[in-house]
Regions:
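Conserved small/polar residues in nucleotide/adenosyl-binding loops
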Residues: 248-253
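Acidic, Ser/Thr-rich peripheral helices and adjacent loops at domain boundaries
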Residues: 243-247
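Catalytic-loop motifs flanking and including active-site residues across diverse enzymes
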Residues: 51, 55, 131, 207-211
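RNA-binding accessory domains that recognize and position tRNA/RNA substrates
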Residues: 1-121, 138-193
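Loop-centered beta-sheet repeat module
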Residues: 184, 190-225
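A short acidic (Asp/Glu
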Residues: 80-86, 134-137, 165-166, 201-203, ...
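Glycine-rich active-site/cofactor-binding loop and its immediate structural neighborhood
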Residues: 123-135, 139
């Protein structure tokens, strides 16, 4: 038995709701089943070609726990530049935590970056917290100078700060966050429910790949993906999930 990331076709429930599923199988016989339930105030519209990018980022730390070669099967083609960046990402984590994370080689159907639609719109994670509000406001009001992005949508993860099964708490937080976003002109708001934490990894070391993997299902709709930073260039620590040294390797196509 070899290491395999198997991606399943999207389950489209309505124009506003889609479920994505994938399973990571290791040569040792372990399996990690993951899902993303995606709902939106508008249409979801998932492009199957984007699924390989999304799930490879989503599972990269679990792959590194095993190490070795992984084949990716099912719908989706992995962006060439992302494949290179994930190799850099794995190399860095292997240097920082060699007893936990190992180098990996990913074999997948590839697509040249020129095949990925070039969009100027951005999507950002939005929890309703101070860092998320600052990021959204800063870009919507054009306060980031040359780095200002055309932020048109946000996404909130159920299974991150709020537990996957705490529906009542999440619904209240989502409703409040939606009001905040509408006040600054953002009407496209996604919710992604996921069982990422069930993989049993150190969340503080791995959560950023959940956020980026979740947003990368929209590669064909948005050209930029944002999340509030845990630290600045002059005050950050590593190893840590979100740090300026490695953000480009998972954020950029």
């Amino acid at each position: 038995m070899s290491n395999e990331l198997r991606i399943f076709p999207p389950e489209v429930h309505s124009p506003h709701k889609t479920t994505l599923k994938a399973v990571l199988s290791t040569a040792a016989g372990r399996e990690f089943h993951q899902y993303m339930d995606i709902e939106s105030t508008g249409n979801v519209d998932i492009d199957k070609d984007d699924l390989a990018d999304a799930w490879c980022i989503f599972f990269i730390h679990k792959m590194m726990e095993t190490g070795g070669e992984f084949s990716v099967t099912g719908p989706g083609r992995l962006s060439r530049s992302l494949l290179v960046n994930l190799d850099r990402y794995a190399e860095a984590w292997n240097r920082w935590m060699p007893n936990v994370f190992h180098r990996v080689t990913i074999h997948a159907a590839e697509r040249d970056d020129s095949a990925v639609p070039q969009r100027d719109e951005a999507i950002s994670c939005f929890s309703g917290g101070l860092d998320a509000c600052f990021t959204a406001y800063r870009h919507r009001k054009g306060l980031a100078g040359p780095q200002t992005l055309n932020l048109t949508a946000c996404v909130m993860f159920q299974g991150a700060d709020i537990a996957e099964n705490n529906q009542e708490h999440f619904d209240k937080a989502f409703s409040k966050a939606r009001e905040l976003l509408e006040d600054i002109g953002i009407c496209q708001f996604y919710r992604i429910r996921t069982n990422f934490r069930n993989m049993g990894m150190d969340y503080e070391m791995t959560y950023h790949t959940m956020l980026m993997g979740g947003m990368r299902v929209f590669t064909s709709r948005f050209g930029y993906f944002m999340a509030g930073s845990e630290g600045s260039y002059d005050s950050f620590s590593y190893p840590w999930a979100s740090n300026p040294c490695l953000l480009y390797t998972s954020d950029a196509a």
